[in-house]
């Protein structure tokens, strides 16, 4: 069995997984949440890289050949180093990988992020060429969205606002509570006051789709709100079509397994918020 791996520091990656499964239901998936060490947003580049590298290697050891970083912070702070440093080392040391019990050790391995797929579509979502980004502090500080968008659409002006309390609100089950309105409105007002010309807003954290009803209630109707999940799923589908050597190795039984570094019962309870279903969860150590 060669599932597609999806990793997040917390629960937000479940929204990405849900979108991917809706578009590509035939594949097998393995979700890993490093919930015991979440959140990653305020951690340094070095720590996020090391934690993400550990998770990716764990997913490889569990049979994954392709891993999606369903976490903006990990995509911003760790993806490039893993792609440019760790993956080439794996390919040049395939014999050592077999000794380390990495399943299907001689197959090529790939790790993809979720920032690039979002940046690729933003130019087609704005008329004013003024775009807003709502994200965690770590993602905003990394300037990853700014760099990707400038490469693809240099005429776009990006204004970014950090929303440090939004993800904790979601994980606390408060996404629909009246108390969340204050924090949502505060950041949206800040964003639109910094650039009133914005006509498209990126939700740069995979937790934020659960706040979408509140977000839309405070954003003008002419401003398009862009969630990542469907665009990541479409990008993955295109990637698999372009890379038959990867796609042909992916198992197709329509099964999903869930793993967490924290208490499985707690994960199961919180996963219900994101997936609206009860899932079986196993504990894993990194």
Q: What is the role of each PLM region?
A:
Residues 1-286:
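Non-catalytic structural scaffold of enzyme domains
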